[in-house]
Amino acid sequence: MANIDNKEQTELDQQDMEDVEDIEEEEAGEDANSKARQLTAQMMQNPQVLAALQERLDDLVGTPTGYIESLPKVVKRRVNALKNLQVKCAQIEAKFYEEVHELERKYAALYQPLFDKRSDIINATYEPTEEECEWKVDEEEDISGDLKDKAKLEEEKKDEEKEDPKGIPEFWLTVFKNVDLLSDMVQEHDEPILKHLKDIKVKFSEAGQPMSFTLEFHFEPNDFFTNEVLTKTYKMRSEPDESDPFSFDGPEIMGCTGCLIDWKKGKNVTLKTIKKKQKHKGRGTVRTVTKTVPNDSFFNFFSPPEVPENGELDDDAEAILTADFEIGHFLRERIIPRSVLYFTGEAIEDDDDDYDEEGEEADDEEGEEEADEDNDPDYEPKKDQNPAECKQQ
C-alpha cells in the first residue's frame, strides 16, 4: 500500500514539474516577445537606425525576388516581353507630359491679362471699380448689421487718420512671409529690398524648344541694385532614362541658371564683411584684418550651384539644388497663380486643413489598433504590423 502511495506521489510530483516547466517556458516566451517588442520600438525611434533601414530598402528596389529567379526560362522570356511593353508605356507617358507642357504654355497666354491686371492693382497703376471690388462674404464671415456699420465707421476713421496708401503695399513680401518654404529664405536684411518687388511672372519655353520655364522677379527702382528684372531658368526633361527607364515618373528638373545681380556699392546683402584680430607669433603685435564671406540671403536664390558635365555633385550642392527645385516648382505651380490667397492666408489654411485630415486619419487608425489590443487577449502587434514599404518618387 505504501508502495502504491509512493508511486502516485512520484507521478504527481513529475506532473507538477512538467506543469512548472510549461509555465516557465510560457513565461520565457512572453518575456522574449515583450523584449522583442521593446527593442523594435526603440529601434523605430532611433533616426539613425531608420535611415539605415531606409537605405537598405532602397538598395532592394529593383532586386529580383527568389520567385522570379525560380521561374522557367520560357516564363522569364514572357516577363521580359512585358518589360519591353512597360518601356513603351513610359515613352508614351513622356509624350503625354510634353503635350501637357504645350497646354500650359498655351493657357499661360490666357492667364496673363488677368495677372497683368493684378499687378496693376497691386502697384497702383489701376484703381478697381466698385463693381470689381464687390465680394460676397461667406455666412460664417458675415456679421450682424450693427456690428458691420460700427466696423465700417471705425475703418473709415482709421483711413482718414492714415496717409492714403497706394495699391497694396508690400504685397509680395507679405506672401513670402506667410509661406514657410519662402519665409525660411528671407532674412531681415532682405525685407527692405523685397518691399520693392512689383511682380513675379513665369515664362514657358517656346514651341519646339527644349522644355524649360523662367521665373521673372520684377522690381521697381531701388537703392540696392540696378536690375529691373531678376531671372531664374529651370531646364526640364521629359524622357525615360535609357539606363533606368522604369524610374520615369514625369518631367524632372535637370538644372537651373540664375542671373548676375548688379549690386550698388555697399548694398550686396549676399556678402558680409567680418573683422578678425591676428597676433604676430614673434613680436606679439596684434592687427585687425577684414574679410568678405558669404551671407545668408534670399538673393542667393539667383546664384545656384553649377551642375558639372558629369552630373556629380557633393552632398551640400545636391541638397541646395534639391531645395531650389522644390522652391522653383512651388513658385510656378502655387504662388504665382494664387498669390492673393497666400497674401490673405486662405491658401495656407487650406494646406493646413489637408494635413489635419491626414493626421486625424492616422489617429483613427492608431485608435483602432489600440482597441484590437485591448479587446483581443491573443493580440500580438508583430502579427499585425506591415513590413516597411519603400515608394519610389
From Swiss-Prot:
Motif (NAP1L motif): 126-151
Biased composition (Acidic residues): 11-30, 132-144, 347-378
Comp. bias regions, Basic and acidic residues: 1-10, 145-165, 379-393
Record's keyword annotation contains Phosphoprotein: yes
Location(s) in or outside the cell: Cytoplasm; Nucleus
Keywords: Cytoplasm, Developmental protein, Differentiation, Nucleus, Phosphoprotein, Spermatogenesis, Transcription, Transcription regulation
GO biological process: nucleosome assembly; positive regulation of transcription by RNA polymerase II; primitive hemopoiesis; spermatogenesis
Cross-referenced SUPFAM superfamilies: NAP-like (SSF143113)
Residues covered by region (Disordered): 1-36, 132-165, 347-393
Record motif Nuclear localization signal, residues: 274-280
One of the record's GO cellular component terms: nucleus
Known role: Acts as a chaperone for the linker histone to facilitate deposition of histone B4 onto linker DNA. Required for both remodeling of sperm chromatin into nucleosomes, and linker histone binding to nucleosome core dimers. Plays a role in tissue-specific gene regulation. Required for primitive hemopoiesis, acting upstream of tal1/scl.
Domain notes: The NAP1L motif is required for the histone chaperone activity. The acidic domains are probably involved in the interaction with histones.
Family classification: Belongs to the nucleosome assembly protein (NAP) family.
Name by which UniProt lists this protein: Nucleosome assembly protein 1-like 1
Native source species: Xenopus tropicalis (Western clawed frog)
Taxonomic classification: Eukaryota, Metazoa, Chordata, Craniata, Vertebrata
Gene that produces this protein: nap1l1
